[in-house]
Amino acid sequence: MEKLKKYVLSTRFLFIAVLALSVVVFLLMLFPDTGSLLGPNIFIFWILLAFSGMGLAIITYKERISGKLKFFLLSSGFSSGGFLLGVVLHNAFYALGTLTEDLAILHAFLNFLEGTFFLIAVIACPIGLLVGLVGTLILWIKDGKRA
């Protein structure tokens, strides 16, 4: 049991989980006609991706990984966790913006925050995730060839 716990809480396992869940989420968003995974059911995969990303970031710090590998693993972890956070905050600020249409300054500020978190969720996090995944894979492949 202790061996299984060490394997599940390793950077390699969590990185593979982030990679697999990223592919699943990307395919589900690219092809939305997947039956029962339409609508709110995709949140299951988004939550799993966010938790595995946060776990990857935590384990990267705990294992005291350094150098370029640390940068790429943290980029993967934070970007996969930040995606769900950006989506939720974008929708929350949109809802608050519709409630405060009469208050011009507050409405404009909430619309600014809505757009900011939309750009974070749709542009910044996927780019960071892609950079982290590809960079980690390249470093691990180079490390495997040296050994």
Which stretches of residues belong to each language-model region?
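N-terminal signal-anchor transmembrane alpha-helix
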Residues: 1-55
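Membrane-interface helix-boundary motifs at transmembrane edges
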Residues: 2-8, 35-38, 60-72, 145
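Alpha-helical membrane-associated segments of multi-pass integral membrane proteins
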Residues: 10-18, 104-142
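Alpha-helical transmembrane segments
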Residues: 21-25, 51-55, 83-87, 124-135
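Transmembrane helix-loop junctions and nearby membrane-interface residues
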Residues: 26-34, 57, 61, 87-95, ...
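Interfacial non-cytosolic loop connecting adjacent transmembrane helices
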Residues: 33-44, 85-122
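Canonical alpha-helical transmembrane segments
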Residues: 45-75
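Hydrophobic alpha-helical membrane-insertion segments
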Residues: 72-91
